[in-house]
Amino acid sequence: MIATGGVITGLAALKRQDSTRSQYHLSAQSPGPAPEKKTTKRKPRADVVVVRGKIRLYSASGFFLVLGVLILMAGIAMAVLGYWPHKDQPKAPETKMSANNTQSFGREQAGSIAQFLEQHMHSEKMKMLGPFTMGIGIFIFICANAILHENRDRETKVIHMRDMYSTVIDIHSLRIKEQKCTNGACMGPYGGDTEIRTFGLDSQFASRLAANTLMSFSGLDGDVRFSHRTSSADDDDGLMSEARGGFCLLSPTYKDRSECIFGFQDDGRWEDRRGALKKCQTRSIVSSSISAFTLPVIKLNNCVIDEPDIDSITEDLEQSRVHSRPPSMESLTVPVPDIAKAFKPPGVQLLRSNSATESASSTSSRSSLSPGSTSGRFLSPGAARKDFGSNNSIHMLSAHSKSLDLERGPTKLTVQPEQRKHPSWPRLDRSNSKGYTRLENKEDPMDRLIVPPVDVKKDYTKKEKLLMISRSHNNLSFEHDEFMSSGLKRGTSETRF
């Protein structure tokens, strides 16, 4: 079958050659621009190059091919001797005797070959063995021919595979070079987009929200505030602008992540490296606030912070905004804790809006600088790690995140006594969080620590408000130092789920 297939392919090739020759003769006979037609017809044949292996006759299959041909020739000769036609029959006996004498004389002269031919001429053995020998020769010839063509096809396959491998390797090397060139040209020194793939959508939104929170607490850009946005496009633009404003506050590792997520780089990157001292002062606050931002609602060390009434704060909101100035990182001071004035029966209040947070931060900064307030000291890196640790930043971020989740404007808010007792209810009720259970009638360990609230006067002067805010910060720092001295771990917190 393989031999017949090879013969059929050869016949098809001959037919193609005949068709091309006939077309060539017709084009030569037809008048017109003959050379142009010749060139146009020869070009596609020159482009198509059929690569095939060689038929190697100097091999075992070639030897058997020759052997089969020889056996076939011997069988043909034997069949010819057996089926050689007979002569005319003798006419008379006299002539027959004379003919026998002449034949005997010719036999002596002819020799052994003539004797062999005369003996096996018209013999039954030759008639039988001749075709049989021919069949054996033909069988050996066909098998050897098939083996020769199989070897040639194997060589052609090897050649094609080598060509394919070489082309694939060349294409792969060219692609690698192109990718290197494109990565070096487009990505530049920050090469690659692997960090973008590693961070998902949740980490992107969390980092954006963390950048916005840092902007609100840093005060470097006083005009940046959280506002209610209706469209998603305006929300993305606002987040990008706020992240660019607070980009200088991030530590180096988070700055690289924010570069990958937001898609921009800091313009004054090299200038910020020169001011490493200022970064050293703010790095502890930023790192602790970012690490604590992804935590749920947190209650700090089982203590309640004493804060003024939210109704009295919201009444003087516009006046505090007029007189407040954006605080800088150099003006941040840590009040020295006063043990005599530290403890006060706490009245639990919640900051419900970003405006209340801004007014509280501005009044606290002014109280630290005013002569009537408690004595303070400038912020150093060690003090930042100690006083502005994870506890304070977590409290600030939790209060601020509540204002973000509630999405309330700078309006007057009232706090129910049940909500004062359980500060995590509004966030868990209004957010789409799953897995949280409300502790309604169960015994709360905070109830044991909370002293019955004292009636607070509604009419406070500005000095009294400032004193109350400063006492709340003194209360927090005093309890923090007390826990540190007792051997507890830093940043211990109780998470309510």
UniProtKB/Swiss-Prot annotation:
Residues 20-30 have a biased composition (Polar residues). Glycans are attached at residue 100. Residues 20-44, 353-385, 400-438 are annotated as: Disordered. Residues 83-127 are extracellular. It is a multi-pass membrane protein. GO terms for cellular component: membrane. It comes from the Eukaryota. It holds the Pfam family DUF2371. Keywords: Glycoprotein, Membrane, Transmembrane, Transmembrane helix. Residues 353-375 have a biased composition (Low complexity). The chain crosses the membrane at residues 62-82, 128-148. Residues 1-61, 149-497 are cytoplasmic. It is found in: Membrane. Belongs to the TMEM200 family. PANTHER family: AGAP005329-PA, TRANSMEMBRANE PROTEIN 200A. This is Transmembrane protein 200A.
